[in-house]
């Protein structure tokens, strides 16, 4: 089968907050993209047989000490290159031009004036773009021509057509650049001649081949949490190795209400997946007893999952492989990324909470995908819309939604409250408009009045965000009537909660989950 990773786009990451967004925008046009460290050598790049290179933006000035740099031989490699913001500055510098800090940066929405459409700007109708720069080009290199300028006279787009080098001062990957998708499309297909073969169907075929080759005649254990990612992994493994794939759902006591029963029914009855359910709640909760630190809770849950899998696998026969639903954003947030600029935000149970010595060979078939791509794969595999469109659910389950100590009483309170929350979102027809919604039990009690009695009960936070891949998220503007219904029904139905608050924090600065 043709390698989907060849003839794609390699993105050198200079620390931009938008680097992953560039990767997503390229993939949305069915072209494979991969993020690499800026130190990647030309030989290493050529070995991947890319069709083009994109140089990302970044927070540095190119003249700063220790500013990120790259192998400038790439410029003369013959590969089409698109430099964005900091990438434009690097191309300018190494082509003999000049970049300066004038003290007059441009940040936010801006207008540009197009002088020469050329191939890159062909079909571009809107002049609205998104700028985020302090430095600017003050001397255009020989052989380059300016295609567009900002209203302040700053070079906005330029090109060296002979070498297929192109650059923008603005960010075409950001939605605020209204014709950014068209600009990227021109670069991918009219300049770099990329082939749109990064599709869900091709991805499935490639992964099935890889899994079959890797596993051979062996058997695979697939952990299912009830969320979209693990469900898609279970379906993909079932397609690859059939009954030799053992989907295991471990009830760690931290699932949503009725989660285990619903998950088993959907996979077994709907797809014929070989699935087993095990109640391990007593073991998990005893390990978590008294622990309040969120990182330690994640590690405990991750470790216990592997130990439980190991024991369960031995009971199921000779199983040497473990499949996980690790996604690309999981790896990025855990600091296991291509750029040295990454910082650990929080460990994910799939990538940071595992024991050093594992008794399994790990399979992570979705680790290159963003969440929206996972849903497309799920659709291609024949999963129902109700499964595919379920909101993301973390592997540690409610363990990261109970702030502070985890007890059975607190779990029961959160399960019941969250069930009511989801029911109302469905009733009001807004569930599918939200990327992720959930409840969080706070270790704070507040005074209230019910009837003629004073109450002193738990505070519950509810959260709902919109997003496309989980990398960034905005809080969902919940209709006031829906908020009122949620609060009223929870407070009146769930014993132990007397106050509900709504979290209106975006990501960044917050993360989607509280822990």
Predicted feature residues:
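Extended catalytic-interface subdomain
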Residues: 324-326
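RNA-binding accessory domains that recognize and position tRNA/RNA substrates
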Residues: 1-55, 59-77, 93-320, 329, ...
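Conserved pre-ATP/AMP-binding loop-to-beta segment of ANL
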Residues: 78-82
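Gly/Ala-rich beta-loop-alpha elbow adjacent to hydrolase catalytic centers
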Residues: 83, 87, 92
């Amino acid at each position: 089968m043709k390698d989907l990773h060849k003839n794609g786009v390699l993105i050198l990451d200079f620390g931009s907050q938008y680097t992953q967004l560039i990767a997503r925008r390229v993939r949305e046009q069915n072209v494979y993209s991969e993020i690499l460290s800026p130190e990647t050598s030309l030989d290493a790049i050529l070995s991947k047989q890319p069709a083009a290179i994109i140089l990302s933006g970044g927070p540095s000035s190119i003249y700063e000490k220790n500013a990120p740099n790259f192998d400038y031989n790439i410029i003369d490699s013959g590969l089409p290159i698109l430099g964005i913001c900091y990438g434009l500055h690097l191309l300018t510098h190494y082509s003999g031009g000049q970049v300066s800090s004038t003290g007059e940066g441009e940040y936010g929405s801006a207008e540009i004036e197009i002088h020469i459409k050329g191939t890159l700007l062909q079909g571009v109708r809107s002049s609205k773009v998104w700028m985020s720069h302090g430095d600017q080009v003050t001397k255009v290199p020989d052989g380059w021509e300016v295609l567009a300028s900002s209203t302040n006279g700053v070079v906005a787009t330029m090109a060296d057509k002979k070498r297929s080098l192109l650059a923008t001062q603005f960010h075409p990957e950001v939605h605020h650049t209204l014709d950014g998708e068209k600009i990227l499309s021109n670069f991918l297909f009219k300049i770099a001649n990329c082939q749109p073969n990064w599709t869900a169907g091709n991805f499935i075929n490639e992964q099935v081949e890889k899994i079959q080759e890797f596993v051979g005649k062996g058997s695979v254990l697939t952990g299912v949490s009830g969320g979209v990612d693990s469900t898609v992994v279970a379906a993909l493994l079932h397609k690859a190795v059939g009954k030799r794939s053992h989907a295991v759902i471990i009830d760690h006591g931290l699932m949503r209400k009725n989660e285990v029963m619903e998950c088993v029914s959907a996979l077994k009855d709907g797809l014929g997946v070989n699935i087993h359910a095990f109640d391990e709640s007593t073991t998990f909760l005893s390990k978590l007893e008294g622990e309040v630190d969120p990182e330690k809770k994640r590690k405990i849950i991750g470790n216990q999952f592997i130990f439980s899998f190991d024991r369960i696998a031995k009971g199921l026969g000779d199983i040497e492989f473990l499949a996980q639903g690790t996604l690309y954003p999981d790896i990025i947030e855990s600091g296991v990324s291509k750029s040295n600029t990454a910082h650990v935000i929080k460990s994910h149970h799939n990538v940071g909470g595992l024991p050093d010595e594992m008794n399994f060979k790990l399979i992570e078939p979705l680790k290159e995908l963003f969440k929206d791509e996972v849903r497309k794969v799920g659709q291609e595999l024949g999963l129902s819309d109700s499964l595919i469109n379920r909101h993301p659910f973390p592997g540690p389950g409610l363990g990261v939604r109970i702030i502070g100590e985890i007890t059975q009483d607190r779990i029961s309170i959160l399960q019941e409250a969250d069930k009511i929350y989801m029911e109302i979102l469905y009733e009001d027809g807004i569930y599918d408009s939200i990327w992720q919604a959930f409840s969080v039990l706070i270790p704070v009690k507040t005074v209230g009045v019910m009837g003629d009695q004073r109450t002193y009960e738990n505070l519950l936070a509810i959260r709902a965000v919109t997003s496309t891949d989980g990398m960034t998220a905005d809080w969902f503007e919940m209709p006031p009537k829906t908020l009122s219904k949620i609060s009223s029904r929870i407070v009146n139905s769930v014993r132990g909660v007397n106050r509900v608050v709504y979290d209106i924090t975006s990501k960044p600065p917050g993360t989607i989950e509280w822990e």
